[in-house]
Amino acid sequence: MQLSLGPVLYNWAPERWRDFYFRIADEAPVDVVSVGEIVCSKRSPFFADHIPAVVERLQSAGKEVLLGSLILVSLRRERRQTEELASAEGALVEVNDLTCLRTLAGRAHAIGPFVNIYNEASAAFHDAHGARRICLPPELPLASL
């Protein structure tokens, strides 16, 4: 079993955001870390300059890094942002909105907690289309696993 840390959902100052992930890299006993702005596309530019350093630091510490997509993609610029994310090299994309799947076109990726996977058929569908990791919804009863 691996311990995963989801992305920061809060609107922190960019330096605080960066320093948080640096501490995770140096101190936290987690295996997988999801980074990126998933809540609001308007906040993305504030963190963009820090993402390469954060990814490098986490990977150097032996963490697997997932690049999180937006939870809700509705604007043209958000679709472009999703396409840019899908073309990124060096880390799996964590899909949090199904519009991201089109741009991944069968490439390896992760399914984040904001995509509802409640049954085996859904999991099999995503597996067949490149999902290598699926984060199940927290409300899913243990008996259903």
Q: What does each model-identified segment do?
A:
Residues P14-E15, S41-V54, R76-E78, V95-R107, ...:
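Active-site-adjacent beta->alpha loops and helix N-cap segments on the catalytic face
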